[in-house]
Design a protein with these regions (language model features):
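N-terminal Rossmann NAD(P)H-binding glycine-rich loop of SDR-like oxidoreductase domains
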Residues: 2-24
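Residues forming the Rossmann-fold NAD(P)(H) cofactor-binding site
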Residues: 14-16, 90, 146
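Conserved glycine-rich Rossmann-like NAD(P)H-binding loop of the short-chain dehydrogenase/reductase
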Residues: 26-35
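NAD(P)H-binding glycine-rich loop region in Rossmannoid oxidoreductase-like domains
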Residues: 45-91, 99
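Conserved cofactor-binding/catalytic machinery of classical short-chain dehydrogenase/reductase
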Residues: 54, 91-95, 107, 147-148
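Active-site beta-alpha turn of Rossmann-fold NAD(P)-dependent dehydrogenases/reductases
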Residues: 72, 109-112, 168
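Conserved Rossmann-fold NAD(P)-dependent oxidoreductase catalytic core, especially the SDR/UDP-sugar
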Residues: 95-141, 163
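Active-site Tyr-X1-5-Lys
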Residues: 136-166
Length: 170
């Protein structure tokens, strides 16, 4: 049975992934950052205390993992939290990519955001070839998701097999 690792497993997307992956008979390992275990109640999952911003803690967590669902993110639109947002969404994503590549993970599914793209022209469909935000004065969350996505794409060039998903606000 395949082993799936979920970052951000106590969040909205992560907790729904737990439900779906267990239905599909995956073994599920969850990185628990905040100690809120409500998302795991009633599910046979492995819970490991961890923090994606702490690179040295990730190697044992990624051991024997087949697929990583990287949903962890700090969602905040307040510019005062720019450094914390970048720490999680950019540096944390780099750490997840490095740990995935080092551990020989078969697939990384990165949850970016539609907010990683420039919104204009608004009348045109937003397709994945639209330019990523690169304005340092942009909303910190938006810029962090664009920069995190660029990191994932850089790791793909190094051999990481990854897919990027762009959910809307959830």
């Amino acid at each position: 049975m395949a082993l799936a690792l979920i970052t951000g497993s106590s969040g909205h997307v992560g907790s729904n992934l737990i439900r779906e992956l267990t239905k599909q008979n995956y073994n599920v390992r969850c990185i628990d950052f905040d100690g809120d275990h409500r998302a795991y109640e009633g599910f046979d999952v492995e819970i490991i205390k961890g923090d994606i911003t702490n690179k040295s803690s990730l190697d044992p967590i990624f051991k024997n993992v087949d697929v990583v669902f990287h949903t962890a993110a700090l969602i905040n639109l307040d510019r005062r939290y720019r450094d914390q947002i970048r720490s999680v969404n950019v540096d944390g994503t780099r750490n997840v990519c490095e740990a995935s590549l080092s551990a020989g993970v078969k697939k990384l599914i990165h949850f970016s955001s539609v907010d990683a793209f420039y919104r204009f022209p608004i009348e045109e469909p937003l397709l994945e070839d639209r330019k990523l935000i690169d304005d340092p004065n942009a909303v910190p969350y938006d810029l962090s998701k664009a920069d995190g996505q660029k990191i994932v794409m850089e790791f793909c060039e190094k051999g990481l097999d990854a897919s990027i998903i762009h959910p809307t606000s959830i």
